[in-house]
């Protein structure tokens, strides 16, 4: 009886350690810096309301031209500067981050790469600077996450 209890206790401790390390690894993953977003990836804004995440595409990124093209609805809230290279996009308080997302489909696996861009801004104003400079509101952070892999048949839906 004592051996079984001891084994269960050790198993629980190991599970807690693994979960803790996994969570910490996920947080630290946000410090990785890939070269740049993928060609034609969609720039997304993230809005969290009542604990549910909602996304809205605000534009696309062209890796060859190193430019971010914003769609019409996003441009309603964005104003180009005199140089034409910078945009100022005022964010609602509920949209703290921008997302660059790109998905690829293999033979049997579906892989989605999420590039998280967090800007350091004053107030709720985010400056989208020409991406040749690699800066966004002073700093740019890209994180890669691998979405859940599913079978090719489910990915074709």
What are these regions (language model features)?
Residues 3-4, 12-42, 57-58:
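Sequence/structural signature of beta-propeller modules
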Residues 32-39, 49, 100-110, 152-157:
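Structural signature of eukaryotic scaffold interfaces centered on beta-propeller domains
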Residues 43-46, 52-59, 64-76, 122-129:
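Structural motif
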Residues 53-55, 83, 89, 133-136:
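Residue-level signal for glycine
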Residues 59-61, 89, 95, 139-140:
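Short hydrophobic alpha-helix segments
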Residues 70-102:
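Flexible internal linker/loop segments at domain or repeat junctions
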Residues 92-133:
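Loop/turn-rich, solvent-exposed surfaces of beta-rich toroidal or solenoidal domains
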Residues 97-100, 135-157:
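Conserved blade-ending motifs and adjacent loop-strand segments that build the rim/top face
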């Amino acid at each position: 009886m004592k051996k079984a209890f001891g084994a269960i206790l050790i198993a629980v401790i190991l599970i807690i350690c693994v979960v803790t390390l996994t969570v910490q690894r996920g947080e630290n993953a946000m410090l990785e810096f890939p070269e740049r977003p993928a060609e034609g990836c969609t720039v997304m804004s993230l809005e969290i309301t009542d604990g549910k995440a909602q996304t809205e595409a605000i534009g696309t990124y062209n890796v060859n031209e190193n430019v971010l093209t914003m769609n019409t609805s996003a441009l309603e809230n964005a104003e180009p500067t005199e140089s034409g290279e910078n945009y100022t996009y005022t964010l609602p308080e509920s949209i703290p981050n921008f997302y660059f997302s790109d998905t690829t489909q293999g033979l049997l696996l579906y892989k989605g790469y999420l590039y998280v861009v967090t800007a350091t801004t004053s107030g709720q104003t985010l400056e989208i600077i020409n991406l040749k400079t690699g800066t966004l509101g002073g700093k740019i952070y890209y994180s890669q996450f691998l979405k859940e892999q599913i079978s090719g048949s489910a990915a074709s839906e």
